[in-house]
């Protein structure tokens, strides 16, 4: 009886742990906003709050009296800051903290939805928690604290999760509703500029094409009709990539061709191709940059806290590389959603790595929109790996 009660208690604690991990990451982010963040002086943060205040005063979505120095982002953090300013009009710090608190909750919800839809099950809060923890200084500043790239991660996650919701829906109405919502999320991403089109939509389309071609090639059917019926999920994913890409492109056209005539802003549409001086070595450096984005930092003492954290970040990058290779070797044993996520991450690394090598403008934080796919792939490896250690073999025998 005591053993049963102890086993039941351990199960409850085990089920609670991932949610505690997720909550701890959120609390840490909020503590940083409230305490150290109060004393951080940053012109970009101040300008975001000024814009939110002006938009509240004008009662508009965009402002003609503002120069958008980092692209014209229609769906961005100013919506959350505007809510904060309505509650705390005389305290910008509390207004900003409230806005970030709501934005991070929406981010967590999108991560949990995506994790559920790709079948991660009990690993879902672990994945969402990993995304919410500030695992590197750049990630902390540009995503969890500054929020500059939070929307660039949120909208692709939401788009992908809603495409899967549409595929998994049993009835026509929720299927169509989820597809429409996915298009709206993609449209919002496109309205923010070209970035998400390149970092997410192009790899999304490439990954679904590869997934569909490999499925059709191995299905063993002799007619297109039978093959498409057999590979239904793969074909629906390809359709989802197509209609969300069209929506994202429509948003970008509105941004670059219509809004550009009425508003002043910097556009990355003017970035030019520039042949890398070091050829393939430049591509290698940029891809290695990606695997360093999990917390590794140059120039810190090995045995200091920051140095140990940097070493852990390097190990996470190495672990991710192992997960990609291992899952590609076990590709045929994976479920469709798991195969797709591996192909999506590989497509992101390939498309972005090659593009960043040739772009005139590059920063390491350009990689952040691919972080949800990276942590999903790590979770898939943990979920699907079948270990048969000697002791386990004896137990099974």
Task: Locate predicted features.
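Transmembrane-helix motifs of polytopic, lipid-linked glycan transferases
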Residues: 97-123, 158, 162, 319-326
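Membrane-interface transmembrane helices that cradle and orient dolichyl/undecaprenyl
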Residues: 156-177, 214-218
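Membrane-interface alpha helices of multi-pass inner-membrane proteins
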Residues: 176-205, 246
């Amino acid at each position: 009886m005591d053993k049963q009660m102890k086993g039941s208690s351990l199960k409850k604690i085990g089920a609670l742990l991932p949610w505690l991990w997720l909550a701890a990451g959120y609390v840490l982010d909020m503590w940083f906003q409230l305490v150290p963040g109060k004393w951080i002086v940053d012109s970009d943060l101040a300008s975001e709050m000024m814009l939110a205040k002006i938009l509240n005063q004008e009662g508009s979505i965009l402002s003609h009296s503002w120069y958008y120095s980092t692209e014209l982002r229609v769906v961005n953090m100013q919506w959350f800051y505007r809510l904060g300013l309505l509650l705390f009009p005389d305290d910008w710090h509390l207004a900003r903290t409230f806005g970030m608190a709501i934005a991070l909750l929406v981010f967590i919800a999108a991560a949990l939805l995506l994790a559920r839809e790709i079948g991660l099950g009990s690993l879902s809060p672990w994945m969402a928690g990993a995304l919410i923890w500030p695992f590197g200084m750049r990630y902390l500043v540009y995503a969890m604290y500054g929020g500059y790239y939070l929307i660039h991660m949120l909208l692709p996650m939401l788009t992908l999760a809603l495409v899967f919701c549409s595929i998994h829906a049993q009835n026509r109405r929720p299927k169509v509703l989820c597809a429409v919502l996915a298009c709206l999320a993609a449209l919002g991403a496109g309205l923010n500029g070209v970035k998400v089109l390149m970092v997410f939509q192009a790899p999304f389309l490439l990954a679904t094409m590869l997934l569909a071609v490999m499925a059709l090639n191995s299905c063993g059917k002799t007619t297109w009709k039978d093959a498409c019926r057999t590979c239904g999920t793969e074909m629906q994913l390809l359709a989802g990539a197509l209609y969300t890409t069209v929506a994202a492109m429509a948003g970008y056209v509105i941004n670059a061709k219509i809004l550009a005539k009425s508003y002043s802003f910097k556009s990355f549409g003017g970035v030019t191709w520039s042949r890398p001086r070091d050829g393939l070595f430049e591509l290698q450096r940029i891809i290695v940059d990606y695997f360093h984005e999990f917390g590794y930092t140059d120039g810190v003492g090995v045995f200091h806290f920051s140095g140990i954290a940097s070493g852990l970040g390097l190990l996470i990058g190495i672990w991710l590389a192992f997960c990609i290779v291992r899952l590609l070797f076990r590709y045929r044993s994976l479920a469709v959603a798991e195969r797709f996520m591996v192909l999506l991450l590989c497509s992101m690394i390939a498309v972005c790595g090659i593009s960043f090598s040739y772009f005139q403008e590059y920063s390491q934080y350009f990689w952040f929109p691919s972080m949800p796919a990276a942590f999903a792939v790590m979770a898939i490896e943990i979920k699907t790996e079948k270990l048969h250690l000697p002791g386990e073999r004896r137990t099974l025998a």
